[in-house]
Amino acid sequence: LSQLIRTAFIPSEGNKFVVADFSAIEARVIAWLAGETWVNEVFATHGKIYEATASQMFHVPIEKIAKGNPEYALRQKGKVATLALGYQGGSNALIAMGALNMGLTEEELPDIVQRWRTANPRIRDLWYAVEEAALAVMQTAQPQAIYNLIFNLESDIVYGQSFLTVQLPSGRKLYYPRPFLKENQFGKMAIHYYTVGQQTRKWEVTSTYGGKMTENIVQAIARDCLAETLRRIDAKGLQVVFHVHDEVIIDAPAGTTVEEICDLMAEPIAWAPGLILKGAGFEGNYYMKD
């Protein structure tokens, strides 16, 4: 049904839709933020992150992870690990990402988790650094700066609210309302804060940890990358009619090309030096998933 609903969106008369999104945006952002050098090098060269991840995890030359070779089966493990494990997830994260439907067994999942974390030590360090910085702010009320992020406690005097904030490389901030420290269900001291429950739609308390905060930060930076692209598209005189996650949908004149838009998405961002971005897309007479 959702596929049919998408096709109801059509461009204005005489125009076409140009649809483009970022390729592997979260994998690119987290590697850039953490300084995971080998991942950044993959994105700067061939871009085969699933094959490269499998190569790192299983110590197999990447050239062997190709169709027709028995080692090609490792690509699936590299893919699901890349998609599922960037935010401190374990076996359950792999299962949620469909690992068992990909032919993997539950028994081999802990090994995949361990291999991925060993291959990505700087991303693993990022999780713990984020958690330690947030806890330090809560315990000392002093700002903490790590990885081009600034953690702080801020207050709204007018409304009597307090926030744990994280200033992103762009200068924008994430806000965690009414934060406090309390033991979580695992008996570990953790940050708790108020959020609107997805089911209840009411304010309720939730806890967080390094990996989850890293996810918030990475996805927020990815959003800021999208905002830069929206500005560039607007500066070209083109109209973005809507955007979905990291995807832009442009009501474009016939002469506009997909390559033109992808080039805008790949341009360097001043506040993110060294972040390598890439766009991919298509054009058509109605909206759809590529």
Predicted regions and their residues:
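Conserved catalytic core of nucleotide polymerization and phosphodiester-bond processing enzymes
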Residues: L1-D290
